[in-house]
């Protein structure tokens, strides 16, 4: 009895020492982290962060603490990187140490670390390598996907002609077109524009994407451990994601029934074949959960980001009609009114290219960027960032860095034009992020945006119910994503 009592005391003493040492080490590390406002227990810096003006709050903190600072999203610390220099030093110069995915509470709640976008470590590396190779096989970066994009754009042009110049909301017109391009790769087919299930899926994507940028979405990022047990619209957003997963699961079942291992038809087939090849590997990352989540990643990201950018671009071109007029002029000179635009035309159209880049810079569709996580304790500048710390590359601060863009808050294509009117690249053009976890859909997105804008503007002029000076381009939401204000417009045949 005495021996067992002494053993218990020893065990408890050892545990106490370990806990004290762990707390001491954590506090020691926190003291060496980048500066920031003092957090309160549990709520962190909630009182300093206005969820409706999240970016503005961060901007003020940057003025006080410098380009590398720490905030506490609820109880968890997060390092914010502000401006090109800080983001480049972290994501490029220390790419491997920042190659894990940071915490994105809502998506982590749903994806649980599966899928190519929200996974880390070896899982992320294998899925990313496979996804890039497979998408390339199905035309990524080649004429195959360009031909699909051109074909899909022809359906859009006809749909816009059928409006007969009426005032419409362009949202679902663009999301249907963009989504059909990625659908042809991951599902092997496109959807008819009046397909009710397709329209339902697009609604699910849009609503869950917008939820992330609402005040409730920002609160969930800070207090998810509590809020996922409370009533609220976070549960509806979760159901939207579940609806998307259910649809993909049905698609996978269809492919399984008709699979020919020697002739993959789409991304799902290729993944199923890889699953069969590795079924005896106990450590394989090619299993059903990763198939569902990776396909959902591609379908979601391949639909909403380009659709939002294009829609926002329409609004900007209506506010600045002189810019649209110069694009029309260049399109007529280089392509004409009858020939179908091709992506190779962008090499001969410096003004149009500059406008499309400026739209992406100004729209800034994912302002904070997706967070990274440190794979080990790292030294960054004069600071120590502990392993597992979330690091946000604030992409908006790079895209609006005054060192690279003379008037960063103005919409001005001259940001991407030299003195001779030729297209000028910028190292600070990072809407797709950089480093080990950059968006591998970048080449597809650039090609899509060029084909969409040139083909639509070859055929139509844009008209707003409002005078240009009255058009408000302030985003409806600006935190996780930049969501344009609701607007209507007319597509008038040229």
From Swiss-Prot:
Its main location: endoplasmic reticulum. One of its GO terms (cellular component) is endoplasmic reticulum membrane. GO terms for biological process: coumarin metabolic process; epoxygenase P450 pathway; xenobiotic metabolic process. It catalyses: an organic molecule + reduced [NADPH--hemoprotein reductase] + O2 = an alcohol + oxidized [NADPH--hemoprotein reductase] + H2O + H(+). The gene is CYP2A8. Keywords: Endoplasmic reticulum, Heme, Iron, Membrane, Metal-binding, Microsome, Monooxygenase, Oxidoreductase. Belongs to the cytochrome P450 family. It comes from Mesocricetus auratus. Gene3D superfamilies: Cytochrome P450 (1.10.630.10). Liver. Its cofactor is heme. This is Cytochrome P450 2A8. GO terms for molecular function: arachidonate epoxygenase activity; heme binding; iron ion binding; oxidoreductase activity, acting on paired donors, with incorporation or reduction of molecular oxygen, reduced flavin or flavoprotein as one donor, and incorporation of one atom of oxygen. PROSITE patterns: CYTOCHROME_P450.
């Amino acid at each position: 009895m005495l021996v067992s009592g002494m053993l218990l005391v020893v065990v408890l003493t050892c545990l106490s020492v370990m806990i004290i040492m762990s707390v001491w080490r954590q506090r020691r590390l926190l003291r060496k982290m980048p500066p920031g406002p003092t957090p309160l227990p549990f709520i962190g810096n909630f009182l300093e962060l206005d969820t409706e003006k999240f970016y503005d709050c961060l901007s003020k903190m940057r003025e006080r603490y410098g380009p590398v600072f720490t905030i506490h999203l609820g109880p968890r610390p997060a390092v914010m990187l502000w401006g090109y220099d800080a983001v480049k030093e972290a994501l490029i110069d220390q790419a491997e140490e920042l190659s894990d995915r940071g915490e994105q509470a809502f998506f982590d709640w749903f994806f649980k670390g599966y899928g190519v976008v929200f996974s880390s470590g070896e899982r992320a590396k294998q899925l990313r390598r496979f996804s890039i190779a497979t998408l390339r096989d199905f035309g990524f970066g080649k004429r195959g996907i360009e031909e699909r994009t051109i074909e899909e754009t022809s359906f859009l042009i006809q749909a816009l002609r059928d409006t007969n110049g009426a005032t419409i909301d362009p949202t679902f017109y663009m999301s249907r077109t963009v989504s059909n391009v990625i659908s042809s790769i991951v599902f092997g087919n496109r959807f008819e524009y009046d397909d009710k299930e397709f329209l339902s899926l697009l609604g699910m994507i849009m609503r869950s994407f917008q939820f992330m940028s609402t005040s409730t979405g920002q609160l969930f990022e800070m207090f998810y451990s509590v809020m996922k047990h409370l009533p609220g619209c976070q549960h509806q957003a979760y159901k939207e994601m579940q609806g998307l997963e259910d649809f993909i699961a049905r698609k996978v079942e269809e492919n399984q029934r008709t699979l020919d291992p020697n002739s993959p038809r789409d991304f799902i087939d290729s993944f199923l074949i890889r699953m069969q090849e590795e079924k005896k590997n106990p450590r394989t990352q090619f299993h059903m959960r990763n198939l569902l989540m990776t396909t959902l990643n591609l379908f979601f990201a391949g639909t909403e980001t380009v659709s939002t950018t294009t829609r926002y671009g329409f609004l900007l071109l209506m506010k600045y009609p002189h810019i649209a007029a110069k694009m029309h002029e260049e399109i007529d000179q280089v392509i004409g009114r009858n020939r179908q635009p091709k992506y190779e035309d962008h090499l001969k159209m410096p003004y149009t290219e500059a406008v499309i880049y400026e739209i992406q810079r100004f729209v800034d569709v994912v302002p904070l960027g997706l967070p990274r996580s440190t794979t080990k304790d790292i030294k960054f500048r004069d600071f120590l960032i502990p392993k597992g710390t979330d690091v946000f590359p604030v992409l908006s601060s790079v895209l609006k860095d005054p060192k690279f863009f003379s008037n960063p808050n103005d919409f001005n294509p001259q940001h991407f034009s030299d003195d001779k009117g030729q297209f000028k690249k910028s190292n600070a053009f990072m809407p797709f992020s950089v480093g080990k976890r950059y968006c591998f859909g970048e080449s597809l997105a650039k090609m899509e945006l060029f084909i969409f804008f040139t083909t639509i503007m070859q055929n139509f002029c844009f008209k707003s119910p409002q005078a240009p000076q009255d058009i408000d381009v302030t985003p409806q939401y600006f935190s996780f994503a930049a969501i344009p204000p609701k607007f209507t417009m007319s597509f008038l045949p040229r």
